Amino acid sequence: MPNHCYQYVYLAGNPKKIDRLYKAVKEERFLDEVIPQPTNLFHGALGEEERKMCEEKGISNWYDWRNENWLTKWDIKEPEICDEPTFEQDVKIFSFRCWTAWAPPTPVWDRLHEMGFDIHAEYEDEGGMFVGEYQNGEDKCWEPEEEEAC
């Protein structure tokens, strides 16, 4: 079953913040940089016992927390920088390609937009089930025509 969602992401914003995001992309911790995971998450394997233990202790587990907050179970994978950070007027820009599991991390993109970044992303499911485009808080997703599919 297809699992990857491939993305191209363009970001523009405050130079110091762009530098931090650029570093996070290269280290495959982009989503965690924007919406950090709580430090008290359970990070082990998740069977029935572990889920019960988390519920009893009142703590979340990594899997459910990431799905609820990022819409994907992992941070970005296999990032490829398309455009290195450069200045354009008073902002810094860069772009990259990557993939996430299942879906695009639109909550992360929404948070970046709320933080004042200019963000544009294009994404597609590896199985051709959906494609989409996100720009500054607006997400458009559709089922591609057969000739558009990956």
Which residues does each PLM region occupy?
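Long, contiguous binding/interaction regions
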Residues: 1-150
